C-alpha cells in the first residue's frame, strides 16, 4: 500500500549520517548495527551532543545503497527525532523488504511506525509536562539521562511507559560526568518495593572511542 502510494514520487529524507558500528548503550550494547541518523528534532535539550541540524537530502535509493554496503542486518533508526520524519514509513518498508531488523531510538512523544521491531525511548525530564499529557505507552527499553528532578520524573515514566528494561545514564555537566549522582539515584530507585528495577547504562561507544 505504501509503495503504491509513493510510486510516482519517491520521497527524500534529511540524513545526518549513515554508518555501521556497535550499539553503545542499553540492552543491546555490543550489537553490530547500521545507524541511520535523521535530521531535526521536536525538542531542544541543552546538553544534546547530536548535530541533528547538520543534514543533507538523501533519496531512498541513496539510503538503500549506503545501508546495503554494510554487513549488519540490524538497523537503528535514530536522530534527531525519527518519529517526526514525513513519509518515513515508506523507507522503513524498503528496509523490511530487505529483511532488516528495525530498532528505533525516540524521545517517546510521537507514535511509533508499525514497521519497527524494537523501541528504545529516552524521555527528557526537561519536558516532563509533555509526558504527563501524552507519550507512547510501551517500549522495549527506557533510557533516561540523569540531569535534574530525576526521582519524580523516573516515577512518572514508570507510570506512563511500560518497559521490560529501565536504564539511567550519566551525562556530562561542566566537563564532568555525574556518575556518582546517577548510581546514587539507582540505589534509591531499586530500594522501593514492587517497582521496576533500574540499571546503569553507559555510552560505551564513547569510552572505547568508536562512533
Curated annotation (Swiss-Prot):
Pathway involvement of the protein, from the record: Purine metabolism; 7-cyano-7-deazaguanine biosynthesis
Record-listed E.C. numbers: 4.3.99.3
GO-annotated molecular function: 4 iron, 4 sulfur cluster binding; carbon-nitrogen lyase activity; magnesium ion binding; S-adenosyl-L-methionine binding
Subunit structure, interactors included: Homodimer.
Amino acids binding Mg(2+): 50
InterPro entries assigned: 7-CO-7-deazaguanine_synth-like (IPR024924), Aldolase_TIM (IPR013785), rSAM (IPR007197)
Binding sites annotated in the UniProt record for S-adenosyl-L-methionine: 80, 122-124
GN (gene name): queE
Function text: Catalyzes the complex heterocyclic radical-mediated conversion of 6-carboxy-5,6,7,8-tetrahydropterin (CPH4) to 7-carboxy-7-deazaguanine (CDG), a step common to the biosynthetic pathways of all 7-deazapurine-containing compounds.
PANTHER family in the cross-refs: 7-CARBOXY-7-DEAZAGUANINE SYNTHASE
Protein name in the entry: 7-carboxy-7-deazaguanine synthase
Source organism of this protein record: Haemophilus influenzae (strain ATCC 51907 / DSM 11121 / KW20 / Rd)
Alphabetical list of Pfam families matching this protein: Radical_SAM
Binding site for [4Fe-4S] cluster: 41, 45, 48
Amino acid at each position: 500500500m505504501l509503495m503504491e502510494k509513493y510510486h510516482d514520487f519517491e520521497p527524500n529524507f534529511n540524513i545526518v549520517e549513515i554508518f555501521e558500528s556497535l550499539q553503545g548503550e542499553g540492552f543491546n550494547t555490543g550489537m553490530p548495527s547500521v545507524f541511520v541518523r535523521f535530521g531535526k528534532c521536536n525538542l531542544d535539550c541543552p546538553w544534546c551532543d547530536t548535530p541533528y541540524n547538520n543534514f543533507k537530502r538523501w533519496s531512498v535509493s541513496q539510503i538503500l545503497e549506503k545501508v546495503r554496503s554494510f554487513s549488519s542486518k540490524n538497523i537503528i533508526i535514530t536522530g534527531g527525532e525519527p518519529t517526526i520524519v514525513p513519509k518515513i514509513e515508506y523507507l522503513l518498508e524498503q528496509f523490511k523488504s530487505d529483511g532488516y531488523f528495525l530498532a528505533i531510538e525516540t524521545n517517546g512523544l510521537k507514535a511509533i511506525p508499525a514497521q519497527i521491531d524494537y523501541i528504545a525511548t529516552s524521555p527528557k525530564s526537561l519536558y516532563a509536562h509533555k509526558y504527563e499529557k501524552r507519550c507512547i505507552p510501551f517500549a522495549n527499553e527506557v533510557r533516561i539521562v540523569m540531569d535534574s528532578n530525576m526521582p519524580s520524573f523516573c516515577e512518572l515514566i514508570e507510570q506512563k511507559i511500560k518497559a521490560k528494561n529501565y536504564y539511567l545514564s550519566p551525562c556530562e555537566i561542566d566537563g564532568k560526568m555525574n556518575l556518582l549522582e546517577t548510581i546514587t539515584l539507582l540505589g534509591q530507585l531499586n530500594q522501593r518495593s514492587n517497582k521496576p528495577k533500574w540499571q546503569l547504562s553507559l555510552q560505551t561507544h564513547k569510552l572505547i572511542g568508536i562512533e
